[in-house]
């Protein structure tokens, strides 16, 4: 019997599997796809976030010229931003798994059963795998993770192109975090939920451009995002000449937190770890995998008398302590506000937000502020914001009051 069975081999699965294996635990991996199969999606992260972990060698690209547009003048961010070398990131975790003796089993988890001191996962092929604890990392629709139902799920959606263009779609050597300019849209189109350009120069005349909806319920269709991207490029006199890769991105931003008393532990999207106000997650995987692994190792090492349910509860609390739960609800509260803002309010909000001390907006986006620091940053934003943003923040609609009280009442 294994100490832990990790289901899934995406970034979340490899991150927690590597941390568990490095702690000397007997870990089995179960994945429906080859864990060594190359990842396709791009993953970005702020430079200091990776530097603080001593993992800057995992960057494939890094930009010091980082800007956003919430009007005609660029906002200089004064922080560098990077794109992971996907192969390097994947190999980093796979090497740690191998060093810890982890073995991968190809197969799809089909059923799970629990007794007092272990869980048994049955694969679609009928194989049974037993472990003291199961960690499900199979994403936002993880079959073994229970969470409250919600009819108000907001999705971040994006359509992007890596390729070559008739002329640079952005300045050479530049990274654009958000370009909310909408001069390429008709007045009627501007009444629809706003989208922004996320773009970067990858070198050798290759650029990545992506039209992104920060969050919308229901999700903005890919066809509309693609149309808007081509409209944006055409307005700037840019045509697509070579498409090397098309990227489609869709994930929920505000999934309810899982049931923290269940006997299966989640990680990554399965554990609602997407930053509700920004969509970032890979930095959180790197920072929080050790927290979960430590909690699991402590539960296994402290006493063999811990039941499966008790071990899972200890693990969940290691991943979601009270302060993180409270911050999560505050971020969800903020997301509700952003989705209600008009285009003008949204631009005014972001102009104010990125006018905060850079440690505050950076800490907000990376979820590295303490709870008191987060509240201080939000109060400062309210004090400095123009009246239309203040009014939007004060006006309470929909789920906003519920989320506010959940943040206060979290235990």
UniProtKB/Swiss-Prot annotation:
Reactions it catalyzes: a carotenoid psi-end group = a carotenoid beta-end derivative; all-trans-lycopene = gamma-carotene; gamma-carotene = all-trans-beta-carotene; all-trans-neurosporene = beta-zeacarotene
Cofactor(s) this protein cannot do without: FAD
EC class of the enzyme, as a word: isomerase
UniProt binding sites for NAD(+): 4-32
Protein name: Lycopene beta cyclase
Xref: Pfam families: Lycopene_cycl
InterPro entries: FAD/NAD-bd_sf (IPR036188), LycopCyc (IPR054896), Lycopene_cyclase_b/e (IPR010108)
Gene Ontology BP, a term: carotenoid biosynthetic process
Metabolic or biological pathway, per its Swiss-Prot or TrEMBL entry: Carotenoid biosynthesis; beta-carotene biosynthesis; Carotenoid biosynthesis; beta-zeacarotene biosynthesis
Assigned protein family: Belongs to the lycopene cyclase family.
GO molecular function, one term: lycopene beta cyclase activity
Superkingdom in the source lineage: Bacteria
Species, as recorded: Synechococcus elongatus (strain ATCC 33912 / PCC 7942 / FACHB-805)
Function as written in the Swiss-Prot or TrEMBL entry: Catalyzes the double cyclization reaction which converts lycopene to beta-carotene. It also converts neurosporene to the monocyclic beta-zeacarotene but does not cyclize zeta-carotene.
Enzyme Commission number(s) of this protein: 5.5.1.19
Protein encoded by which gene: crtL
Free-text activity regulation comment from the record: Inhibited by the bleaching herbicide 2-(4-methylphenoxy)triethylamine hydrochloride (MPTA).
Keywords: Carotenoid biosynthesis, FAD, Flavoprotein, Isomerase, NAD, NADP
């Amino acid at each position: 019997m294994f100490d832990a069975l990790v289901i899934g081999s995406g970034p979340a699965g490899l991150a927690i599997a590597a941390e568990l294996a490095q702690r000397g635990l007997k870990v089995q991996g179960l994945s429906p796809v080859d864990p060594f199969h190359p990842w396709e999606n791009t993953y970005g992260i702020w430079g200091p976030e990776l530097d603080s972990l001593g993992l800057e060698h995992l960057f494939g690209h890094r930009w010091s010229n980082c800007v956003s547009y919430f009007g005609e003048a660029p906002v200089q961010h004064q922080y560098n931003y990077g794109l992971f070398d996907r192969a390097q990131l994947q190999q980093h975790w796979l090497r740690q798994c191998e060093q810890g003796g982890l073995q991968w089993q190809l197969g799809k988890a089909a059923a799970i059963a629990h007794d007092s001191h272990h869980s048994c996962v049955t694969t679609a092929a009928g194989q049974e795998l037993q472990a003291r604890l199961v960690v499900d990392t199979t994403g936002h629709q993880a079959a073994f993770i229970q969470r409250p139902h919600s009819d108000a799920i907001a999705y971040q959606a994006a359509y992007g192109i890596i390729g070559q263009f008739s002329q640079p779609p952005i300045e050479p050597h530049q990274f654009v975090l958000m370009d909310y300019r909408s001069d390429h849209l008709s007045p009627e189109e501007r009444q629809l939920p706003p989208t922004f350009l996320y773009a970067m120069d990858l070198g050798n005349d290759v650029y990545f451009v992506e039209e992104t909806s920060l969050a919308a319920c229901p999700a903005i269709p890919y066809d509309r995002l693609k149309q808007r991207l081509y409209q944006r490029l055409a307005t700037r006199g840019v045509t697509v000449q070579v498409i090397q890769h098309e990227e489609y991105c869709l994930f929920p931003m505000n999934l309810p937190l899982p049931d923290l008393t269940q006997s299966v532990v989640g990680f990554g999207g399965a554990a609602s770890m997407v930053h509700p106000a920004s969509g970032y997650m890979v930095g959180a995987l790197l920072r929080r995998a050790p927290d979960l692994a430590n909690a699991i190792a402590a539960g296994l090492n402290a006493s063999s008398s811990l039941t499966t349910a008790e071990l899972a509860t200890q693990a969940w609390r290691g991943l979601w302590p009270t302060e993180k739960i409270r911050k999560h609800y505050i971020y969800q509260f903020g997301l509700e506000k952003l989705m209600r803002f008009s285009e003008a309010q949204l631009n005014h909000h972001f102009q104010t937000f990125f006018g905060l001390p850079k440690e505050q907006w950076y800490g907000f986006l990376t979820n590295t502020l303490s709870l008191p620091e987060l509240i201080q940053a939000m109060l400062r934003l309210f004090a400095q914001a123009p009246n239309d943003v203040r009014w939007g923040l004060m006006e309470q609609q929909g789920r906003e009051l519920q989320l506010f009280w959940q943040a206060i009442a979290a235990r």
